[in-house]
Amino acid sequence: MANSAQARKRARQAAKANSHNSALRSKFRTAIKAVRKAIDAGDKAKAAEIFQASSKTIDIIADKNIVHKNKAARHKSRLAAAIKGLQASAAQ
């Protein structure tokens, strides 16, 4: 248990930051799942539209250092490749 005033304040701040960061990490995962769901449905236009919105969300969360920028880029790249592959498989 924190005894000094500054230790109590740091504990409060850490709890608040943890709660906020957890919500943003959840938003990150939800954005990825939304695109994956559209890709699995096979609707390229809808998947591309959702990817645009999710891409912004992913970038914002990476800018806040909730996830590393390389992790965000990796997820965006894989989602974009999956959408592009969806177009190729639909054409064949």
From Swiss-Prot:
It holds the Pfam family Ribosomal_S20p. Keywords: Ribonucleoprotein, Ribosomal protein, RNA-binding, rRNA-binding. GO terms for molecular function: small ribosomal subunit rRNA binding; structural constituent of ribosome. Residues 1-25 are annotated as: Disordered. It comes from the Bacteria. GO terms for biological process: translation. GO terms for cellular component: cytosol; small ribosomal subunit. Belongs to the bacterial ribosomal protein bS20 family. Binds directly to 16S ribosomal RNA. This is Small ribosomal subunit protein bS20. The lineage of its organism: Bacteria, Pseudomonadati, Pseudomonadota, Betaproteobacteria, Burkholderiales.
